[in-house]
Amino acid sequence: SVVLSTLLKYRKVIPCIHPAAALREYLARYNIVNDLRRAKDQAGFPEVKHLTRDLILNPSFADTMSFLDTCNKAKEVAYDIEIRGQELSHIAFAINPSVAICIPFVEGMKDYWAPDQEASVMLKIAEVLENPEVAKIGQNLSFDATFMYYKYGIHVAPLQDTMIAAGILFPDFPKGLDFLVSLYCDGEPYYKDDGKEWFKNPFASEEIFRRYNAMDAAVLMEIYPKQVKELERMGNKITYDRQKSLLHPLVYAGNKGIRMDTEGMVKAGEGCNERIDGLTRELAEASGRTDLNPNSPKQLKEYFYVDKGIKPYTRKGSISVDDKALKRLAMNGHQEADIILKLRHERKMLGTYYNMKLDEDGRMRCSFNPVGTEQGRISSSKTIRGTGANLQNQPPETQAMMLADPGCLLINQDLGQAENRVVAYIAGEHRMINAFEKGIDIHKQTGSLISEVPIEEVTDDQRSDGKKANHGLNYDLGYKSFALIYQMPEKQAKFIVDRYHSVYPGVRQWHNSVREELSRQARTLVNCYGRKRVFLDRWGHELFKVAYSYCPQSTVAEKMNQDGVLFIYDRQDLFPEVQFLNTIHDSIRYQVPLSVGYERIIEVIKAVKASLEKPITWRGQSFSIPADTELGFSYDKKTMVEWKAHYVDNTHDDKLAEELEIYVREQAA
């Protein structure tokens, strides 16, 4: 913000983060430098120069219809919605950075329009939003487009999203509109709190809130063109286009949701309560105290570190009784810590999962975020109505309660050991590559190499150690953290970590090459799909660990998004029967009506499998990740049929269709 000082007459002021903050939060240095550069530029002239904006805040019916007609003829417009009580209260449109309108639907506690006028306005809004010739620019359109689709059946298209662009350009930075305005809008005074104040008091100034809404649309027309130039300069415009194309399938899947076994959730919650009661009694017996509250950090610190005299565990310089600290205490034989961890787990299962608020039709829905993680993965959260949950991190217990719609079959197809395979090929680790290409059990091989026993003699425990190593050590996890995560003695963890890197030397050689590339290429890495990421945080081990994970994680995300989600959603000419439901990092979920026939279901499975298994190319070498398939009437792995990739490859379609028919009959019996 560039504003006039209230203390020094005729002086301009630019609020700035204190430079000392960069010592604690390294990324703040970029904001500080940006503000100081702006201060230098602003020092060249005395005036406060802000872009003049013509904001229509009290539109007549004629004004509104005329403006929307203008929008309908534009190449692109920006829009922003505001919601109150799950109803559309305002919508703003901008045709350029200087001209915008706020179309209100409420004024205080009254309607702004007569019923016939409101109907005409909404129809005209729908015409603009669905016009295929007019690009709609927005911020976090997953929210806006979901609401307009859920509430009015309006399918907003085509879309351009400044939040997605921000997530591609600078994954380390905030993606909120307030931050983007500070970055791209040349000193525009901060206005975002105006909206928050109105929501606290809807009887406050209508004009202030309407200006806030109109500004949100106007600034988008200023921000987006600058982002496009940066994306093109960075070589990430294609990456942005790919990520943006996920909006429509994610809006569809978020609104579709999945049917839940509501009776099963109630019963599971009752069982959870019984276990909580039992664990509470166990804790009282183990501690000798009936008043010890497992949710009180103050009481737990006092109990473990004062009463019991244990040396305190710290986190960022502060005494801690978080889950990591409790795991360490439990590993050292303190039974109370183990009981508290179990209590926390049961309470989370009860509060977060079994007692979650579903929609009235008994479905779990979510809101997907196309740039929810820094590495390109999709994330999800509760819906804008406060129902549902993160659909991607549900534990096995609640996944087992996810049901197919009547007459449908659920299908889950996942990439086998996807990240591990990508690591093997980009690291050039020949032992790993050999195992994957010859179909050798990679966990068994790693267990064999660590334990120095023939692979045919590897025990279940040794294979388990191999599996833990394969899952945990590709990104330079230290032995102490490895011990904590897998709850084993540090001596054993150190042995496994050292042996792993001894038998797979290519992994640490690859780490060296990543560090060299960061240094040589201005902190920039490129994944197998050409997606570039600049790593801006403090140079050192923590940044390096994130960088090691970038190429494998983002490559798998791109593979799943392009050859899974978009392949199914965009090719409705091939898959008119397929209903896309969810994507979870390295897997895709959908359902198909049984009425299409078993042969057709096998055709669909094989087509999706072939798409997922398209080769990935890394520096001249191509490799493929096999896709396994699970089928069932719920996502309970105990009741699903599992077909490994090689089994589907080597089994005739008629045989697979016959197996599926037998399974369906058995489940119906």
Q: Language model features by range: what are they?
A:
Residues S1-H50:
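Glycine/proline-rich loop-helix segments at beta-alpha junctions forming the active-site rim
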Residues K73-V99, G108, P115-S120, E127, ...:
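Acidic, glycine-rich two-metal-ion catalytic cores of nucleic acid-processing enzymes
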Residues S89, N140-L141, G187, Y212-Q227, ...:
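Core structural elements
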Residues V48-F179, L183, N273, A424:
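Conserved RNase H-like, two-metal-ion catalytic cores of nucleic-acid enzymes
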Residues P46-N58, A62-M65, Y112, D636-A669:
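Acidic, low-complexity intrinsically disordered tails
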Residues K9-A21, S182-I208, A217, M221, ...:
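A short, charged helix-loop
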Residues E47-L55, V156-T162, I168-P171, K192-N293, ...:
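Mixed-charge, glycine-rich, non-catalytic linkers/tails in nucleic-acid processing enzymes
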Residues I238-E336, Y475-V514, R600:
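Extended, well-ordered alpha-helical scaffold/bundle regions in very large, multi-domain proteins
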